[in-house]
């Protein structure tokens, strides 16, 4: 068989597999998406590797159980690292490495959260530069600014001890990023919740209410959305 035809057939097959994985993910069939990733595993396929990291993240995101979250994020990390090694200029590889390393920091406590924060910012900003229209990375950077702005005094003391120049973030910048995420994808509950949380932090209560009212019109698709709806109701009760 002509080598060009062989390469074309392989590329067509991989595109078909990746499209099916994306479809399963869109339908919230995360375990099926994970299985399809594992069944077609290739240590040199950047697009499969970041999808594998995403699948583990999605499973972690469906629960409030910390042990289950940690287990799946730990599984996701080496795949996100490998994807970045293969193609440092892949927007999705940069995005998912930033997401996973950020989640790992949040789950492991204050010091690790601060240590990982610089990587989250570095790879998150690079992902936006490579693909400015992906809502997920705008959300990621919104969360980064929110988390840094929301550091308690003792966490800031730890940050100052670790770094000569601790990370700096503001709720206003978080709001801007969440706004970008909503503009790009107005159907994701996460963007509205975290924009409202940021508005709440700067006492913009009426604007926060308005954002949560918009969120209430969005279809709930999976367990993660159900968790978000409960958080939205809790925040609304404070306004």
Question: Can you describe what each PLM-predicted range is?
Answer:
Residues 9, 13-61:
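N-terminal leader/linker segments that initiate helical-solenoid repeat arrays
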Residues 23-24, 31-32, 54-89, 96-133, ...:
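Short coil/linker segments at helix-helix boundaries
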Residues 48-50, 93, 137, 191, ...:
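TPR alpha-solenoid repeat register
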